[in-house]
């Protein structure tokens, strides 16, 4: 019985977990994408990056993606380097 439990736990750990995250997508220079209130532009941009959806966050005038894969680049604490 214990072997079955250990084997099941080891199998789950070996498979890994594919999570999703939300955030501002960035280009190669760590700059956010400006949207100027265009939700369709942001939704298309986010879906190209394999997100579930996206919208224009109007306070920052930047695209925000929902459900991005874990390996997608999002805005962090670094500056934009144009």
From Swiss-Prot:
GO molecular function terms noted in the UniProt entry: sodium channel inhibitor activity; toxin activity
Disulfide bonds: 31-80, 35-56, 42-63, 46-65
Tissue-wise expression: Expressed by the venom gland.
GO terms for cellular component: extracellular region
Family per record: Belongs to the long (4 C-C) scorpion toxin superfamily. Sodium channel inhibitor family. Alpha subfamily.
Subcellular location: Secreted
Domain LCN-type CS-alpha/beta: 21-81
Pfam families: Toxin_3
Keywords: Disulfide bond, Ion channel impairing toxin, Neurotoxin, Secreted, Signal, Toxin, Voltage-gated sodium channel impairing toxin
UniProt comment concerning the protein's domains: Has the structural arrangement of an alpha-helix connected to antiparallel beta-sheets by disulfide bonds (CS-alpha/beta).
Reported function: Alpha toxins bind voltage-independently at site-3 of sodium channels (Nav) and inhibit the inactivation of the activated channels, thereby blocking neuronal transmission.
GO BP annotations listed: defense response
Lineage: Eukaryota, Metazoa, Ecdysozoa, Arthropoda, Chelicerata
Protein's UniProt name: Toxin Pg8
InterPro entries per record: LCN-type_CS_alpha_beta_dom (IPR044062), Scorpion_toxin-like (IPR003614), Scorpion_toxin-like_sf (IPR036574), Scorpion_toxinL (IPR018218), Scorpion_toxinL/defensin (IPR002061)
Record's signal peptide: 1-19
